[in-house]
């Protein structure tokens, strides 16, 4: 029922051809012909794409093994750092700006690709000197800074996989990741500004390292400092001061670990790891198709720490040779036009943001947008959760019209000019797999949909019996493996392949023409403001650290898509749940409502994880508890 209600808000029969792409738009039938050709021999398709990269040793076998143990480009090896950065050395990209960083308080700096390469080598040399070897994990707990990307690229250069951890997580979640990755070095920042307030990142790291028993080194990037450092801590500038040795790039097997994340499952966040060869093939191809070009100035508002921020901030745009904007503040400080100021000031051509952000921004009024000249934008890409049709239209008309007429666009009437494309991505897959492709064969857009499938990904929607369905709600699945198949995964991922295809865990709907609407999770995993949140992780933390039994449910939230409800056994500690979740787990998992129920009910609710309250209110909770789970 709730999936149907989501579909009602998304569904549209409109077919929109943006004036900026009128010259290249094809029918959906023509697009699907190209798509079906790609999945008719999916292995040959990705083999052709793989030849776009430079391989030190070509693969002898395209693919081997049944899912989830499928591996691609067997016996092939490549220099990952070359394919991301060094390949630009002999062309004009080398002297252009690679990264522009702006802090919330207005400070800014920029570096070219050649300067970036120098910094990466310096950090790589320091890591080698500290004893980091290929295969050793490096952890980052920072906002998006130039230094953060330098560390990630230095990790790639020496063959050390990295995991960036979102700073919205608290010390308890950080500690778990430190333990699971067995890292000997952590990079963080002393603090940074968020909505005008100082976020003390270093203090969170200190609590996490103490709680986890971490014995390694903490490298502190000086953002606001200088901080007073402890014996196991060193300033980033001191860590790299003596590092001048030229570091040879690591040549990796295709299946060598590149980076990892902790993905949200029902009972906890679980570590997953992507391979070097398959991921780089997949992210480079999709980055080209979604619209990235070397002359683009690109602004992605999703931070590394989430898959979109890793794939389409750290890797994709730099492989293309684009200029990447990094911003570590909020969209509303000092006012709600901060993002539009950044786009205007730096002549941004491509914006990638989340549905949740646009939902909130659309409710602040049009003038925050219209007072800025956004003519340089040529596409707006959207991801993370369903995008309602009315929010799509607001984005298209208010952000996407601009001031300069183009073909049939009429600025004074806000008719829209550039494409607004909603796309689907998942941490386990690594890249976008649905959406209209700006740099590929482009069909009309249907507002509210996540577009048609992307070539190379065999997508289907199935009912509970595994039968394909059209114009009915089912589960989004992938029928065949993709190049960036995980090389480390939990048992839940194995279970997703149980029936011979990959179950994404998301409800979806497909029109007869082939457009897909992704509707949200069919399990207890929560999607709130674009974040994928594990309910079990919250329950475990509150049990371990407060001693209270809690079950976590989700409710429909018109701003966040879903919000968190905590129902606990009557206890004096129940009143501490909101503050405890902020401190232990991070502000992104703070419940919107805390209620109480008997212990028996708590356990019954945990066994019914697919419950979704249609509104976030005590009345809705009381109704659920009084009427029972039936």
What are these regions (language model features)?
Residues 217, 526, 553-556, 565-567, ...:
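Conserved C-terminal "lid"/linker of ANL adenylate-forming enzymes
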